[in-house]
């Protein structure tokens, strides 16, 4: 992938950009095999990759510069700003949005937040695009509600320029820290969730719910999990750390009992909406802590699917799964190091199958799907 920002030394986020994709995949596979070297693996499936540019469905832009000439991008470690509107990881559809947002910031008088001076209002702009219909969600992260009335007043102009903006919100993040969002979300549109569709499964994206940033690879990840589950004798499963329900909604069949658990209520609202659309009545989604939910249950399903954050599932949940011993565990991980650590804590299980998904090209990161079977 050619990147003028990288070539000019202005951005180093894609540290592996000079390596061809096959070399990147080989290095990631070697890393994964090294992390799992202590465990016998029955089957290594071929790694899955997607487009090498224009694949991201989300932009997280730090807003800097002045209200008349805002910059959208990032801050270097020394505090100097860098405009990343031309980043080749973004699809071509993002460029007109960035182009319209810059004059809009001036029109609405949204002074960019200055980290050094602790002054200004507009901290971040977060943009997400649906692959199914091209609809977009735009979030303005502000320090306070001071400029909210001005923003509302100026908004019709932006909506006229960009009719693809289906969901627009303001998030209030008052803390002087590098935190992307606060707890308060104010909707400026009637529509509150962005419609998405992977493999004919309806999914919904809300402002504060996690959603994969590489749709081409994520849809293959979900489809693979579905294929693996269909090969297993499973009538009852748990989907822990379920997010908006991507895995559970793909894996569930009309006669299967499934419980999806996620701590974020926004994500659970999305999952419930999808389940209702699919007419799946035996699916339950609850906003709870996954570990607390699991360890409080007496009955054990045949399959537990886990998709934890980078820290992994942790020892308490590993201990519980070891004791209760479901027949199968499917572990989806964005951090193979913590996954390997967790598998060490599950001595009663063997690794049946492993597959790497190149969710983050040009970096050392990847997603991995692992099927564990009770010994």
Curated annotation (Swiss-Prot):
Superkingdom of source: Bacteria
Protein name as annotated: 23S rRNA (uracil(747)-C(5))-methyltransferase RlmC
InterPro entries linked to this entry: 23SrRNA_MeTrfase_RlmC (IPR011825), MeTrfase_TrmA_AS (IPR030390), MeTrfase_TrmA_CS (IPR030391), SAM-dependent_MTases_sf (IPR029063), U5_MeTrfase_fam (IPR010280)
Endpoints of the signal sequence: none
Coiled coil: none
Keyword S-adenosyl-L-methionine assigned: yes
Family under the similarity heading: Belongs to the class I-like SAM-binding methyltransferase superfamily. RNA M5U methyltransferase family. RlmC subfamily.
Enzyme Commission designation: 2.1.1.189
Binding site for [4Fe-4S] cluster: 3, 11, 14, 87
Keywords tagged on the record: 4Fe-4S, Iron, Iron-sulfur, Metal-binding, Methyltransferase, rRNA processing, S-adenosyl-L-methionine, Transferase
Binding site for S-adenosyl-L-methionine: 212, 241, 262, 307
Broad enzyme group: transferase
Function recorded in the entry: Catalyzes the formation of 5-methyl-uridine at position 747 (m5U747) in 23S rRNA.
Pfam families noted in UniProt: tRNA_U5-meth_tr
Biological source species: Shigella boydii serotype 4 (strain Sb227)
GO BP field: rRNA base methylation
Gene Ontology MF annotations: 4 iron, 4 sulfur cluster binding; iron ion binding; rRNA (uridine-C5-)-methyltransferase activity
UniProt catalytic activity: uridine(747) in 23S rRNA + S-adenosyl-L-methionine = 5-methyluridine(747) in 23S rRNA + S-adenosyl-L-homocysteine + H(+)
Active site: 334 (nucleophile)
């Amino acid at each position: 992938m050619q990147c003028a920002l990288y070539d000019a030394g202005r951005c180093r986020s894609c540290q592996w950009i000079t390596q061809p994709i096959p070399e990147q995949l080989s290095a990631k596979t070697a890393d994964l095999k090294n992390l799992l070297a202590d465990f016998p693996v029955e089957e290594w499936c071929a790694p899955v990759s997607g487009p090498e540019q224009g694949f991201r469905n989300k932009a997280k832009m730090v807003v800097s510069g002045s209200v008349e000439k805002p910059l959208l991008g990032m801050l270097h470690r020394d505090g100097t700003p860098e405009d990343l509107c031309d980043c080749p990881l973004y699809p071509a559809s993002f460029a007109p949005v960035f182009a319209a947002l810059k004059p809009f910031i001036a029109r609405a008088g949204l002074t960019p937040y200055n980290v050094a001076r602790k002054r200004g209002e507009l901290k971040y702009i977060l943009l997400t695009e649906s692959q199914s219909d091209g609809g977009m969600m735009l979030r303005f992260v502000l320090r306070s509600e001071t400029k909210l009335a001005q923003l509302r007043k100026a908004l019709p102009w932006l909506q006229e320029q960009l009719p693809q903006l289906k969901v627009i919100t303001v998030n209030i993040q008052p803390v002087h820290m590098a935190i992307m969002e606060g707890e308060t979300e104010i909707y400026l549109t009637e529509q509150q969730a962005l419609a998405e569709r992977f493999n004919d499964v309806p999914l919904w994206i809300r402002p504060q719910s996690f959603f994969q940033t590489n749709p081409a690879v994520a849809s293959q990840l979900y489809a693979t999990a579905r294929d693996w589950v269909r090969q297993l004798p499973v009538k009852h499963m748990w989907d822990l750390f379920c997010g908006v329900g991507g895995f559970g909604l793909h894996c569930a069949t009309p006669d299967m009992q499934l419980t999806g658990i996620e701590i974020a209520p926004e994500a659970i609202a999305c999952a419930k909406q999808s389940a209702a659309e699919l007419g799946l009545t035996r699916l339950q989604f609850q906003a709870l802590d996954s570990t607390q939910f699991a360890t409080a249950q007496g009955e054990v399903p045949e399959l537990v699917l886990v998709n934890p954050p980078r820290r992994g599932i942790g020892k308490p949940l590993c201990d519980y799964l070891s004791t209760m011993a479901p027949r199968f565990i499917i572990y989806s991980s964005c951090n193979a190091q913590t996954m390997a650590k967790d598998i060490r804590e599950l001595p009663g299980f063997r690794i049946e199958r492993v597959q790497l998904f190149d969710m983050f090209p040009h970096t050392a990161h990847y997603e991995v799907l692992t099927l564990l079977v009770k010994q």
